[in-house]
Regions:
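Divalent metal-coordination and catalytic microenvironments
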Residues: 3, 24, 28, 60, ...
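Histidine/acidic residue-rich metal-binding segments in metalloenzymes
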Residues: 76-242
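Alpha-helix-loop-beta-strand connector modules within alpha/beta enzyme cores
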Residues: 45-63, 107-121, 270-274
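Short, acidic/polar
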Residues: 13-21, 70-81, 156-157
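Metal-associated gating/positioning segment near the N- to mid-region
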Residues: 1-55
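His/Asp/Glu-enriched, well-ordered alpha-helical/loop segment
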Residues: 139-167, 235-236, 240-242, 247-317
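Active-site mouth loops of central-metabolism enzymes
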Residues: 2-15, 36-38, 61-74, 142-148
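C-terminal cap of metal-dependent C-N hydrolases
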Residues: 260, 311-361
């Protein structure tokens, strides 16, 4: 997985590196990229090493911050973090608003073939918004975030990429317009890749009619037209990978009035179920590629080999076996999933990696 929040250090009541790795394994993952939105943020060599030291059954790859302490002002010591083991660079959920800073970052990482990961969002447009702007937000009377905030930054990021000829990965893509812009940029042979979450593929803004804060995410759930455009983009190869955007939130952060609830959803452990629920023409082989081969290719990680004598990196799963997602099976310290207490189809049976394995009964 290439975009997960494990909250450690600083917010260990929600998740730790250890529990986050357990959640990832239970979701069938052998590798997870950890975003830098911690306290202190992953802005130094020491912070990168702190995450790297947790490698066990699941390999944790730190994403170093682009700006010092994710403040969006000055560039962080990205090359030092790269040498210490940072897989890529991003300000995570705190998207880069300063175009000059992003321009410098793209130029800088190009010198060592680094990659910037960015969620496209103009926060001046989305501030105070609680959900997607559209018919549903009008009907239920919630302040909204216009999808143009994503589209503008997708366009900006692509143009900065064109100017620098660097590498960027856009994640959390949620609008039809953004997908169209990325598709066009790829045709022009720009080095842009992108990922989408399982919940943006599965759910639309209609889920918020009940004011269920578990569906409050950022980028927000969009229109049914956007959702279908995302599925089409997976089918035609415009979308390169699936990213979990796993965001643990404590009970107190979610069980409040919708306006005050924090954004985010647990999603690592339920990836398989959510993809199997999707009505699409996408084969299970294609999903596996979007979750494993493609991210490894983009971020220059070795592809595991299934042959005699090779180290096994394997996930064994059933597409039909049911399991109940509850306090007993949940590996996270948080419970903020709309699927909690439900019986789900599609079960991870065993994960093998780093000469270790875990079997799920």
């Amino acid at each position: 997985d290439l975009f997960a929040d494990f909250c450690d250090p600083g917010f260990e009541q929600k998740e730790t590196l250890s529990t986050g790795a357990m959640v990832a394994a239970a979701g069938g993952y052998t590798d997870a990229f950890v975003i830098p939105n911690t306290n202190p943020p992953t802005s130094s060599k020491t912070a990168v090493e702190y995450i790297k030291n947790e490698n066990d059954l699941v390999n944790l790859f730190p994403i170093g911050s682009v700006s010092k302490n994710i403040e969006g002002k000055d560039l962080a010591e990205m090359y030092d973090m790269k040498l210490a083991g940072a897989i890529a660079f991003s300000d995570g959920r705190k998207t880069i608003q300063n175009s000059g800073l992003l321009l410098k970052a793209l130029q800088y990482v190009k010198t060592f073939e680094g990659i910037i990961i960015e969620i496209p969002e103009d926060r001046e447009i989305t501030k105070n918004g609680l959900m997607n702007e559209g018919v549903v937000s009008t009907q239920i009377g919630l302040q909204a975030k216009a999808s143009i905030a994503e589209d503008i930054h997708t366009y900006r990021n692509i143009e900065l990429l064109r100017y620098t000829q660097s590498k960027i990965h856009l994640t959390g893509i949620s609008t039809k317009k953004s997908i169209d812009l990325i598709r066009q940029a790829k045709k022009q042979k720009l080095n842009v890749t992108c990922s989408v979450t399982t919940y943006h593929l599965l759910y639309s803004e209609q889920m918020l009619e009940s004011y269920n804060s578990h569906f409050k995410v950022n980028p927000p759930l969009r229109t049914e037209e956007d959702r279908k455009a995302l599925i089409k983009a997976v089918e035609d190869g415009t979308i390169d990978c699936i990213a979990s955007h796993h965001t643990p939130q404590s009970w107190d952060d979610k069980q409040v009035e919708f306006a005050y609830a924090q954004s985010g959803m647990l999603s690592l452990q339920t990836t398989l179920h959510m993809l199997l629920k999707l009505e699409s023409n996408i084969t299970i082989d294609k999903w596996v590629s979007l979750l494993s081969d493609q991210p490894r290719k983009i971020f220059s990680l070795p592809q595991p080999k299934l042959e005699a004598g090779a180290d096994a990196t394997l996930t064994i799963f059933s597409t039909t076996e049911p399991w109940t997602y509850n306090e007993k099976s949940n590996q996270s310290l948080s419970e903020n999933s709309p699927l909690f207490q439900e019986t789900l189809q599609g079960k991870i049976l065993c994960v093998i990696n780093n000469h270790k394995h875990r079997i799920y009964e």
